[in-house]
Swiss-Prot record:
Disulfide bonds: none annotated. Signal peptide: none annotated. Belongs to the Tom40 family. It comes from the Eukaryota. The keyword Disulfide bond does not apply. This is Mitochondrial import receptor subunit TOM40B. GO terms for cellular component: mitochondrial outer membrane translocase complex. GO terms for molecular function: mitochondrion targeting sequence binding; preprotein binding; protein transmembrane transporter activity. Its main location: mitochondrion. Residues 281-308 are annotated as: Required for mitochondrial targeting. The lineage of its organism: Eukaryota, Metazoa, Chordata, Craniata, Vertebrata. InterPro entries: Porin_dom_sf, Porin_Euk/Tom40, Tom40. It comes from Rattus norvegicus. It is a multi-pass membrane protein. It is found in: Mitochondrion outer membrane.
Length: 308
């Protein structure tokens, strides 16, 4: 009797398993590079503001705003927004039309369109009473792992003036994004361009972003300590104005009390804070803010009520 050779069935033979790499994500828009850090800082408040929001349908809503301040005359704003049926993400609905008009007749309007699955268009118009101030047209293409944007600002064929801005972002890895911005302006007797390079690194709990070019530098650092505490650090340098600013922001959420606190301290000796409180079960949000500039001896405080 000889040795018995046991052969394993073909189905049980070891196989080499090739791990398929996940595709790189889309880096988003160039304007959103510093958004996480900027959302930590409080918005400037001054005077008394009343905002009443009214949802008329699933597509249309309006808002009435009355603002009274010691720095100027009382003002009224009518804000309208229309959202279409095509929801690309929880925060993106197409088409979208937004308009804001004040008591003097000045208008700010914005139109967002989805021309194709990856191609978006935006038009922005701004008037001061009966005079056009700004008209801007954007085209954005979002690939699998890159975003390219071209913006035309105040194009005037007769006056031969235009502002062109080109953005490009590329995902290098799942955490690293690199890109740049090219700003070109032309008007009679003047022409120039500014190039800015950008980079963004996203970790599990923090995000670091840097823009640097001939016009200056902008760096930000965002850190999420836990579900309640977020901090942000921002540095801006402007070569034309020969000015630098360093800011520290703090964001605290108290879900049990329905309160949100935002504070800031910067290198210009400015200290500010805003406290928001939701008055449940009423659809009312109260906000109280104060800002003090020690260097210029200026103090501003504000109070707002938002209904709806």
């Amino acid at each position: 009797m000889g040795n018995t050779l046991g052969l394993a069935p073909m189905g049980t033979l070891p196989r080499w398993s090739h791990r398929r790499e996940e595709p790189l994500p889309n880096p988003g828009s160039f304007d959103e590079l510093h958004r996480l850090c900027k959302d930590v800082f409080p918005a400037q408040m001054e005077g008394v503001k009343l905002v009443v929001n009214k949802v008329l349908s699933s597509h249309f809503q309006v808002a009435h705003t009355v603002h009274m301040s010691a720095l100027g005359l009382p003002g009224y704003h009518l804000h309208t927004a229309y959202a279409g049926d095509w929801q690309l993400s929880p925060t993106e609905v197409f088409p979208t039309v937004v308009g804001d008009m004040d008591s003097s007749g000045s208008l700010n309007a914005q139109v967002l369109l989805l021309l194709a699955e990856r191609l978006r268009a935006k038009a922005v118009f701004q008037t001061q009473q009966a005079k056009f101030l700004t008209w801007q047209f954007d085209g954005e293409y979002r690939g699998d792992d890159y975003t390219a944007t071209l913006t035309l600002g105040n194009p005037d064929l007769i006056g031969e003036s235009v502002i062109m801005v080109a953005h490009f972002l590329q995902s290098i890895t799942h955490r690293l994004v690199l890109g740049g911005e090219l700003v070109y302006h032309r008007r009679p007797g003047e022409e120039g361009a500014i190039l800015t390079l950008a980079g963004k690194y996203s970790a599990l709990h923090w995000v670091a972003t840097l823009n640097v070019g001939s016009g200056g530098a902008h760096a930000s650092y965002y850190h999420k300590a836990n579900e309640q505490v977020q901090v942000g650090v921002e540095f801006e340098a402007n070569t034309r104005l020969q000015d630098t600013t360093f800011s520290f922001g703090y964001h605290l959420t108290l879900p049990q009390a329905d309160m949100v606190f935002r504070g800031l301290v910067d290198s210009n000796w400015c200290v500010g804070a805003v406290l928001e409180k939701k008055m449940r079960p009423l659809p009312v949000t109260l906000a109280l803010g104060a800002f003090l500039n020690h260097w210029r001896n200026r103090f501003h405080c504000g109070f707002s009520i938002t209904v709806g």
